[in-house]
């Protein structure tokens, strides 16, 4: 049985982290060995990069291109140290964010050069793409309200303007339209149970082929 790479994507507060955990529990109950990881922060080096990237904007401002390069560095380390070796061992990996986040946030959100972003993604991933990406689609105001309700303070990205987050959301919509077989949209504003069931229904046919 070969390894599989499933990514969860979406704007802030879309519920992807909770849904990824529920998905992992479901797969484990089916007897599948699962690894949960995230970007940024999927390695020891990545933990340090995550702290730099998400600290509040007023603490230490980060230039937009610097931000892009730090995300690429995190991804390169993650792919080399964790993703490729674990997939080669036949593991199922569930990842909270991957290359589509960079396209949506730094490409659409920051309006950085898409050719540069694709080049950096190609270098960082070495061609590794997800088998399936679950895009949890929620209205940006709903997602940010959820984050504020957590009472833990907003990080540097979450503090961005509504206009920024709307551009990110449009980026995800465009990505899903251009890669419909890889990126599957799920309505993230439905109940947690309904979203989880929908994800099960999406993945079940693939599991029959993979197992």
UniProtKB/Swiss-Prot annotation:
Pfam family, one: Thymidylate_kin
CDD domains documented for this protein: TMPK
Catalytic activity, as annotated: dTMP + ATP = dTDP + ADP
Family: Belongs to the thymidylate kinase family.
Protein name according to UniProt: Thymidylate kinase
Entry superkingdom: Bacteria
Record-listed E.C. numbers: 2.7.4.9
Function: Phosphorylation of dTMP to form dTDP in both de novo and salvage pathways of dTTP synthesis.
Gene3D superfamilies on file: P-loop containing nucleotide triphosphate hydrolases
UniProt keyword list: ATP-binding, Kinase, Nucleotide biosynthesis, Nucleotide-binding, Transferase
InterPro entries (UniProt xref): P-loop_NTPase, Thymidylate_kin-like_dom, Thymidylate_kin_CS, Thymidylate_kinase
